[in-house]
A protein has these predicted regions:
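N-terminal loops that bind phosphate or other acidic moieties
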Residues: 1-163
Length: 163
């Protein structure tokens, strides 16, 4: 398993492990099916990772397409869009720069597709601080750590946002 596919597996596991919490949160203002969608996204992530070749651009595109296939809901489509846009942004070269480009493109793609903005209690509120932290990094590992910290802070901040 490569570092990339290992990371994809961690995201898939986190989605599955938190599916009940997603259902609870979604049932407050929605139909409560976000946990099911999270599980379906995890299946798409794993299917894409299983076909990964080591070509970042192709692997991100494959994962996006697999998510779209397994989770054809609104949230699944947004998640897939993030990967597909990330795929379009990366190029040959530096891993840190490609990761920065990918996360920024994912944010922009999700915002455009979902017609959402910061402060609306969406995925963007976690992705934006992650992107900012990552874009300020000088090496990949510290950038990923900072991005994870930023994402957690963004998630926590949504609790105090008006619905």
């Amino acid at each position: 398993m490569s570092a990339f596919t290992d990371s994809v597996e961690k995201v898939a596991a986190a989605l599955e492990n938190n599916s009940k919490k997603f259902e609870e949160l979604d049932s407050v203002a929605g139909d409560g099916d976000l946990g099911i969608t999270a599980g379906n996204i995890a299946k798409g992530l794993r299917a894409g990772a299983a076909g990964a070749t080591g070509d970042l651009k192709a692997d991100l595109m494959l994962i996006g397409r697999e998510i779209a296939k397994f989770a054809p809901s609104t949230f699944g489509t947004l998640f897939a869009t993030g990967f597909i846009r990330a795929s379009a942004a990366v190029a040959d070269g530096d891993a840190l720069k490609n990761t920065q480009l990918a996360v920024t493109a994912a944010f922009d793609g999700i915002a455009a597709r979902g017609k959402a903005a910061l402060g609306e209690r969406t995925l963007l509120d976690a992705l934006h601080p992650a992107s900012v932290a990552l874009n300020g990094a000088t090496d990949l590992q510290s950038g990923l750590n900072a991005a994870a910290t930023g994402a957690r802070a963004g998630v926590t901040a949504t609790a105090s946002m008006a619905p």
